[in-house]
């Protein structure tokens, strides 16, 4: 039974994006906020992905081009930001927007798509601590990757918005390579 929802708000009106933890009451169907993380001005939290162990949450920030790791306490409904990594190589000097974050089906990797640099960043999850280590940055073979998902066959499918393509990748869940 899932008890929490993580809601990201970009904060374009007031400039302060946030991620909120909301506890779901299965009897009443209502949500209650239990915690909130405020991003830096204009970093714009975009999406959050929860690890299968329900203790680790990964959030991407669209304008900040970052992935953040949070340790989550599912008893109290609180989280703590522990790590922040870039979603694009340090050599990128142009515009980029992080657009999607996902934990792969094996629970060993986090992937983030980056629009305008047309790439997918892959990070290995430390199985004990939840911390991330960059595996690499891979071209999405299209223009402006918006969303991606994993099929039951283990393949990764990337939807490229501006090239109107869906590209199928072999994903190695041992090395994290696309």
Where do the language-model regions lie?
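Conserved beta-strand positions in repeat-built beta-propeller and related beta-rich domains
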Residues: 6-13, 51, 59-62, 112-115, ...
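Short loop/turn segments immediately following beta-strands, especially the blade-tip
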Residues: 21-30, 70-79, 123-131, 169-178
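Structural motif
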Residues: 14-20, 66-69, 119-122, 165-168
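A short beta-strand motif characteristic of beta-propeller blades
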Residues: 32-38, 83-92, 133-139
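Beta-rich, blade/repeat-based domains predominating
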Residues: 1-3, 39-54, 87-107, 141-154
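Loop/turn-rich, solvent-exposed surfaces of beta-rich toroidal or solenoidal domains
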Residues: 96-160
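Acidic, glycine-rich loop-and-beta core segments that form the ion-binding/anion-interacting portion
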Residues: 38-89
């Amino acid at each position: 039974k899932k008890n929490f929802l993580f809601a990201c708000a970009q904060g374009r009106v007031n400039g302060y994006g946030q991620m909120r933890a909301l506890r779901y009451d299965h009897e009443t169907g209502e949500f209650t906020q239990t915690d909130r993380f405020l991003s830096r001005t204009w970093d714009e939290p975009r999406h959050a992905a929860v690890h299968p162990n329900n203790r680790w949450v990964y959030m991407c920030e669209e304008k900040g081009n970052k992935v953040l790791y949070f340790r989550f306490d599912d008893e109290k409904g609180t989280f703590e930001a522990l790590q922040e990594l870039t979603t694009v190589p340090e050599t990128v000097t142009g515009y980029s927007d992080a657009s999607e974050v996902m934990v792969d089906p094996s629970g060993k990797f986090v992937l983030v798509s980056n629009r305008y640099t047309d790439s997918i960043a892959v990070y290995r999850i430390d199985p004990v601590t939840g911390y991330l280590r960059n595996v690499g940055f891979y071209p999405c073979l299209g223009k402006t990757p918006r969303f991606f998902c994993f099929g039951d066959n283990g393949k990764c499918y990337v939807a490229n918005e501006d090239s109107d393509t869906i590209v199928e990748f072999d994903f190695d869940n041992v090395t994290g390579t696309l």
